[in-house]
């Protein structure tokens, strides 16, 4: 049975391994720690019984001195568990916390050629906001997506 639980330090190694394998951007362990040590309440993991199968890493802080902004930094699901709604449940858990804590907007970036991610976030209500040229280390452009919570 798949459950969504709040981030706990015991999952940091699993998160690092999954994201390094699945996402194109090479993050150091310090990037993960930056998010989960300062804003652990916004990150969640998915478990199948006790097996780690996915995570969403997020934060929320003041943007440009005026706007309380949530940010989805990373989302990854173990390959054989994709297509089962787990990413939606993880993301929704983070969105709910951000909304409850007063987020005025929630943003994320994804590669311009990642059709699956763009479709996923659009289904959750995100709108394409702008193109970020050569955003990723590999030179790929990104689209920034934004959601204005109700």
Swiss-Prot record:
PROSITE patterns given in the database record: GNAT (PS51186)
A single GO molecular function term of this UniProt record: protein N-terminal-methionine acetyltransferase activity
Keywords (A to Z) from UniProt: Acyltransferase, Cytoplasm, Nucleus, Transferase
Annotated source species: Schizosaccharomyces pombe (strain 972 / ATCC 24843)
Name this protein carries in UniProt: N-alpha-acetyltransferase 30
Top-rank taxon: Eukaryota
The family this protein is said to belong to: Belongs to the acetyltransferase family. MAK3 subfamily.
Reaction(s) catalysed (UniProt annotation): N-terminal L-methionyl-L-leucyl-[protein] + acetyl-CoA = N-terminal N(alpha)-acetyl-L-methionyl-L-leucyl-[protein] + CoA + H(+); N-terminal L-methionyl-L-isoleucyl-[protein] + acetyl-CoA = N-terminal N(alpha)-acetyl-L-methionyl-L-isoleucyl-[protein] + CoA + H(+); N-terminal L-methionyl-L-phenylalanyl-[protein] + acetyl-CoA = N-terminal N(alpha)-acetyl-L-methionyl-L-phenylalanyl-[protein] + CoA + H(+); N-terminal L-methionyl-L-tryptophyl-[protein] + acetyl-CoA = N-terminal N(alpha)-acetyl-L-methionyl-L-tryptophyl-[protein] + CoA + H(+)
Entry keyword Chaperone: no
EC number: 2.3.1.256
Location of the protein in the cell: Cytoplasm; Nucleus
GO aspect biological process, one term: protein maturation
Coiled-coil residue windows: none
Record-annotated N-acetyltransferase domain positions: 2-150
């Amino acid at each position: 049975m798949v459950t969504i639980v709040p981030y706990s330090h015991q999952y940091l190694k699993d998160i690092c391994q999954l994201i390094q394998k699945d996402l194109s951007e090479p993050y150091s362990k310090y990037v993960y720690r930056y998010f989960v040590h300062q804003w652990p309440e916004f990150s969640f993991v998915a478990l199948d019984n006790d097996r780690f199968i996915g995570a969403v890493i997020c934060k929320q802080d003041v943007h440009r001195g005026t706007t309380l902004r949530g940010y989805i930094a990373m989302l990854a699901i173990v390959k054989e568990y994709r297509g089962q709604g787990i990413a939606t449940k993880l993301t929704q858990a983070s969105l709910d916390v951000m909304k409850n804590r007063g987020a005025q907007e929630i943003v994320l970036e994804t590669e311009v050629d990642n059709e699956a991610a763009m479709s996923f976030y659009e289904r959750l209500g995100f709108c394409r906001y702008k193109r970020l040229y050569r955003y990723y280390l590999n030179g790929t452009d990104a689209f920034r997506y934004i959601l204005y919570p109700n």
